[in-house]
């Protein structure tokens, strides 16, 4: 999927990751992904402004966190930090 250069903000990021069943939530100095039930998926991303990363970068982060979340859920003994 190709993303045109739009400023990364909550609305544009959420539109871009909706197909993953996720949305982004902003905290103070960080952001994190939640699923439709409101459960946090993956680790928080330390960022001052959402626009410090492209929308495509946020999509990639969402995919990685989603994959890691389900890998931990199904294979907790395989995860090495």
Describe each PLM feature range:
Residues 35-81:
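Detector for the mature cores of small, proteolytically processed
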Residues 6-7, 28, 80:
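Small/flexible residues
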Residues 1-21, 53:
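Negatively charged, low-complexity tracts enriched in Asp/Glu with abundant Ser/Thr
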């Amino acid at each position: 999927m190709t993303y045109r250069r739009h400023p990364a903000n909550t609305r544009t990021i959420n539109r871009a990751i909706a197909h993953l069943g996720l949305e982004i939530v902003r905290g103070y100095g960080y952001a994190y992904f939640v699923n439709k039930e409101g459960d946090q998926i993956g680790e928080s991303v330390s960022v001052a402004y959402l626009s410090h990363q492209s929308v495509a970068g946020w999509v990639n982060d969402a995919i990685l966190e989603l994959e890691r979340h389900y890998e931990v859920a199904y294979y907790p003994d395989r995860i090495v930090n």
